[in-house]
């Protein structure tokens, strides 16, 4: 059954995300967000590092349009590669509209949890803004999860007319 996350009234998305990553249920974490700032990454970094050190995989896509992503926040995410299997793709395309998704996917071999909402990886997006998200549990083979995976893949693929680059520290 889908769950509606209403921040800050009932949930803080940052706490929810930290709890999910620390639960040791998931082997892969993917996210695509419009903006990331150190104000957000400082809350997530210890748990993201532990997730990687426990054998998890992280694949991130971050937009840099409209100057809302900070260098420091991006640098934090890029540094994750030193702790395990982590990639960060930077999305920037001067010829198109702003990259603006907020899509999170936690998965393992038998289960997937998709979260679609308005939360960026900023302190305000994770904790203080009025934000909403819809959480859907399904299998990795379900149509909605396959469609989400296809979206992640297309945003990482420069052959689809999208300017992306994978960075590492």
Please tell me what each predicted stretch does.
Residues 1-169:
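PLD/PLD-like phosphodiesterase catalytic module centered on the HKD motif
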